């Protein structure tokens, strides 16, 4: 039997906690036998004293085990259970293509996703712009879709890692969110509850990233790879660029439109293609569906070219109560904004810098994201035809096309876009889309 205050004292004094102590504390968070003050105190001691790798693994596993852990054995699936998690960005619509592409190559992707957070868009919000799309199928239906289609993207239910929800709420109001061991456990508790064989992490770097510096993004990626492999799940991470909007669009319906166009081959933004392919390659190799980069890329290109990936996306939408002909007729189903008009730079020049975070916040301000959990979303608003770093802009080539609910909203968004995009006399050096791959 342990005492919560003794566990806090031990960590306060800079000592490592045992697996049993960590499990006792996390179970107490779940059962409400540990107070909010005690959660706050432990979070702050971890913030200042960090955790050893064994402590980080124990914390993650205890949080995972605080709720249901999915088990796929009874379905006798003939492929690996794999998933991807992104730290979030703007125009980061990779999940919508990646899930179907990997499923078309023989993987099974039970993706439990999130809503928008701060300036970053949420995969669930994007999918809810599809009429009828059900992000909360019951457990049996979720399993059926995984077995039949190969991929489902759903919201987090209360039975998955419940201790994380309470722990996170306390961290949020006590300035202890940005602690690498706590972020790692929070992300992985939910992902590892999916019962995965392999995981790839997309850790963003740059002006639209969750972590403020390259070094911190790298430290988070290394921590996640270390802990997840320590917990028995083959995991790699890619550090990818978020110094500009990843897709050509940012919003909800506009990003779903771009995802469908990507899958059908109608339009593929080169940077979005690079990042999506790189993540899919990791999933295929870690999931043992391909032996190397070349084989993985060939398989992925084939399912894009032969229409299989687009077909899987359509089947997922239909299985989750969306329209059965969505891929063919997406334009008919997706909501459109009242006012669609381009915004131009005041001078001509080359796009040299982008405050990606500010562009994400501009989408939120237009109604495309939430400032608080109770807000409703306008799925139709956002940006399309975004200029990219190095593009020449003038009176002919706009900075973006703004999809707004009215003229006032358009004016505010136009101001935000102009302020967020800097121009120079010459094009900047091009930056890579993938900076580094991190494996165990």
Curated annotation (Swiss-Prot):
Pfam families: Glycos_trans_3N, Glycos_transf_3, PYNP_C
Assigned EC number: 2.4.2.4
SUPFAM superfamilies: Nucleoside phosphorylase/phosphoribosyltransferase catalytic domain, Nucleoside phosphorylase/phosphoribosyltransferase N-terminal domain, Pyrimidine nucleoside phosphorylase C-terminal domain
A Gene Ontology BP annotation from the UniProt entry: pyrimidine nucleobase metabolic process
Keywords: Glycosyltransferase, Transferase
Class of this enzyme: transferase
Cellular component terms (Gene Ontology): cytosol
Pathway, per record: Pyrimidine metabolism; dTMP biosynthesis via salvage pathway; dTMP from thymine: step 1/2
InterPro entries, per database record: Glycosyl_Trfase_fam3, Glycosyl_Trfase_fam3_N_dom, Glycosyl_Trfase_fam3_N_dom_sf, Nuc_phospho_transferase, PYNP-like_C_sf, PYNP_C, Pyrmidine_PPas_bac/euk, Pyrmidine_PPase_CS
Domain of life: Bacteria
GO MF annotation, one: thymidine phosphorylase activity
Classification via SMART domains: PYNP_C
Family from the record: Belongs to the thymidine/pyrimidine-nucleoside phosphorylase family.
PANTHER family for this protein: THYMIDINE PHOSPHORYLASE
Role noted for this protein: The enzymes which catalyze the reversible phosphorolysis of pyrimidine nucleosides are involved in the degradation of these compounds and in their utilization as carbon and energy sources, or in the rescue of pyrimidine bases for nucleotide synthesis.
HAMAP family: Thymid_phosp (MF_01628)
NCBIfam families xrefs: PRK05820.1, T_phosphoryl, Y_phosphoryl
Name this protein carries in UniProt: Thymidine phosphorylase
Species: Escherichia coli (strain 55989 / EAEC)
Lineage: Bacteria, Pseudomonadati, Pseudomonadota, Gammaproteobacteria, Enterobacterales
